[in-house]
Amino acid sequence: LKDHPDMDMVPRTFIFGAKAAAGYKRAKLTIKLINSVADVINNDKSIGGKLKVVFIEDYRVSNAEIIFAAADVSEQISTASKEASGTGNMKFMLNGALTLGTMDGANVEIVEEVGAENAFIFGMSSDEVIAHEKNRDYQPMDIFNNDQEIRRVLMQLVNGFYAPDDPERFRDIYDSLLNTKSSDRADTYFILKDFRSYAEAHKKIDQAYRDSSWWAKAVSYTHLRAH
């Protein structure tokens, strides 16, 4: 949007809701980053209201009940093979939200119920992830060096774009994506590897949402198959 302010896109709001365990420093830092991103985006008038970011503090059942009912899209984006099956995606499904996700956890069962044509699936399969881990052949730095957009986004983590008062605030997140430290492999969850596929899924959502007839049918079918 900054590069192409006249871009035709369906306005959207990304809603995050989570809690971090008391000693989970990276999770707390991630929440801090989400809020910093929200501050930048939500106060940028040049975006023209096309994009907003919201973080729900003190996420709990009473918050979730509102979000489940309001969401058009349920993002379930754990890396394939990494997530134990949860129930949040099922609650979104019961309320008719279409799933954007990987083939992981309960997403697999949801896609089996609604059909791949009524969901937006992206990313590597579990077998592909496991193969990369076994072969130890994934090099996120190659993506950083060859994808200008991803490189710019990551550099914003350490150049003060989101933290002018402390440019190094998000260094740990940056390092976790690019630098291997002892037993911690860089980009353990293949975030950079899956990103382009994720971005393409969002383009498909943008196109699908414009077809109100198709979207209504997909929502109705998703809701019915949840019962």
Model-inferred region functions:
Residues 38-45, 74, 80-83:
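Short flexible/disordered coil segments
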Residues 8-11, 48-50, 63, 68-72, ...:
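Short, well-ordered loop/turn elements at secondary-structure boundaries
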Residues 17, 218-219:
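Short linear capping/connector segments at secondary-structure termini
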Residues 52-54, 76-79:
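Short, flexible loop segments at the rims of nucleotide/cofactor-binding pockets, characterized by
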Residues 1-64:
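Long, K/E/R/D-enriched contiguous segments that form extended
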